[in-house]
């Protein structure tokens, strides 16, 4: 069955239209010119994604599945989560209405535009958001899922999003450490090209080891075989996977010419340990016994002035003067990757790209200043894995000197990840305020081992009883109390890190 098999006057009935997947399905079908009606057991006031249906002529029945809905529908699309034993399936069978599953919609209604995917451990959201801004600034409309407070990199969302109306697709491709997820997103979103920011340890609790995680990310490379791939050439994991998979397609590399901040070990794809002269965590200059080494880069940033937020970019064609509002060397990597993507995928001239970059203030929850209280600035950042924490805190210390770090993280790599994060915070911070239960446990152990750390680690109560949800490691009250404690210390720059810090950033309004 394909799209042409449905007459123009076909009416599709979508059950569970207040849920993310069926909301997107309804909008796809309406975008393709069909009649769509919806139903949901939620009330109109409680319909989570009701706002995204505004502008669509879709009749929605709330709080019930009325007879009228089934009388009007030529086909029914139920939500994935609805069990086949549900009473509504008895009604569908009794009325002999054909059923299409969400996966049928994906198979039948093909992607009709170029689609670009962005993956990696850190930097995905900033890269995706900036590339979209450049598109909008140049009258190119990227598809938007418009699902309020949804990040949008979960499996079905990017796949369905790619089928909505728009000139191009620009998709963040994430994984919760589940093998096969990225493969399905890349294939079903019909990516034409993509970008990998970096690959550093994450989700180790689910996968067991770094190489297992890296090979989940490698599904992105496999899915783009024969196509265009833009990569951070200073990440040995990415370059090692490209070699291991014998990638046959166009590879465009980018990186940064900067003095390394130190040397760290990283597992090479060959199985050996490789010393990386790091510019940011996990990326820099490297040479492994297996022969893997930093390549000559196609795009390279030089003469970086972080204070003035400027750098020169050497492209295959010319040298560019780049001005940005973003802070930190990690954002130089992000901006360079975006420049390459905007030029190669969006086919925009450099001058148009640079104009847009110069006015990009960043993404909510990424190095975001949320308050100035007295003489103290409070910043939140989503950093939630060891590499992300190290990179962000190193840049903050470089830019501002002494910092107080409030930890709200519960690592997706379990206790090992929590300990590694705490050690990174210990390295770069004047003071540490452990606000998450996971960090408080480690703080107790650290102080027991080294009592002198009481001056640095501010822990004036026992371990909070909090059950983590993903990387959400603290409650609203715990984040607020942590920041409040930080305000009483003799340090004027406070950074609260982790998902809870960004989710509950409005807690500063009460301080």
Predicted regions, residues:
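ATP-dependent carboxylate-amine ligase
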Residues: 1-45, 54-59, 72, 76, ...
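Phosphate-binding loop of NTP-binding sites
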Residues: 4-9, 28-32, 67-69, 80-250, ...
């Amino acid at each position: 069955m394909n799209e042409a098999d449905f007459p123009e006057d076909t009416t599709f009935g979508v059950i569970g239209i207040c849920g993310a997947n069926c909301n997107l399905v309804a909008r796809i079908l309406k975008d393709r010119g069909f009649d769509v009606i919806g139903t949901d057991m939620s009330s109109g006031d409680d319909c989570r994604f009701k706002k995204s249906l505004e502008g669509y002529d879709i009749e929605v029945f709330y709080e019930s599945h009325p007879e009228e809905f089934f009388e009007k529908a030529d086909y029914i699309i139920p939500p994935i989560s609805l069990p086949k034993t549900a009473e509504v399936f008895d009604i569908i069978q009794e009325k002999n209405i054909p059923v299409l599953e969400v996966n049928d919609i994906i198979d039948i209604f093909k992607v009709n535009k170029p689609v670009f995917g962005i993956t990696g451990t850190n930097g995905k959201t900033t890269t995706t958001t900036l590339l979209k801004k450049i598109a909008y600034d140049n009258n190119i409309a990227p598809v938007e899922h418009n699902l309020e407070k949804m990040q949008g990199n979960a499996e079905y969302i990017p796949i369905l999003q790619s089928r909505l109306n728009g000139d191009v697709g620009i998709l963040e491709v994430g994984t919760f450490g589940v093998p096969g997820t990225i493969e399905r997103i890349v294939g079903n979103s019909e990516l034409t090209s993509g970008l990998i920011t970096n690959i550093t340890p994450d989700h180790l609790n689910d996968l067991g080891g770094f190489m297992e995680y890296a090979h989940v990310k490698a599904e992105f490379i496999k899915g783009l075989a024969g196509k265009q791939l833009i990569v951070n050439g200073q990440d040995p994991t990415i370059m090692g996977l490209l070699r291991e998979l014998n990638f046959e397609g166009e590879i465009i590399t980018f990186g940064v010419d900067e003095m390394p901040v130190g040397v760290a070990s990283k597992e090479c794809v060959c199985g050996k340990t490789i010393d990386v002269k790091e510019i940011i965590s996990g990326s820099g200059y490297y040479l492994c016994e297996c022969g893997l080494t930093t390549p000559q880069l196609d795009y390279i940033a030089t003469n970086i002035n972080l204070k003035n937020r400027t750098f020169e970019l050497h492209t295959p064609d010319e040298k560019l003067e780049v001005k940005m509002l973003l802070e930190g060397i990690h954002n130089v990597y992000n901006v360079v990757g975006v420049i390459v993507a905007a030029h190669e995928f969006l086919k925009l001239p450099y001058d148009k790209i640079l104009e847009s970059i110069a006015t990009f203030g960043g993404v909510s929850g990424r190095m975001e200043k949320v308050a100035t209280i007295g003489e103290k600035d409070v910043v939140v950042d989503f950093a939630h894995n060891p590499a992300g924490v190290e990179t962000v805190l190193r840049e903050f210390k470089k830019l501002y000197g002494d910092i107080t770090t409030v930890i709200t993280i519960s690592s997706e790599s379990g206790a090992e990840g929590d300990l590694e994060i705490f050690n990174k915070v210990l390295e770069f911070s004047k003071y540490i305020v452990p606000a998450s239960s996971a960090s408080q446990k480690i703080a107790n152990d650290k102080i027991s081992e080294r009592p002198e750390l009481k001056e640095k680690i501010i822990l004036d109560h026992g371990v909070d009883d909090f059950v983590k949800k993903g990387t959400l490691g603290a409650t609203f009250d715990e984040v607020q109390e942590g920041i409040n404690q930080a305000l009483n210390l003799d340090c004027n720059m406070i950074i609260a890190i982790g998902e809870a810090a960004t989710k509950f950033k409005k807690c500063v309004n009460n301080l």
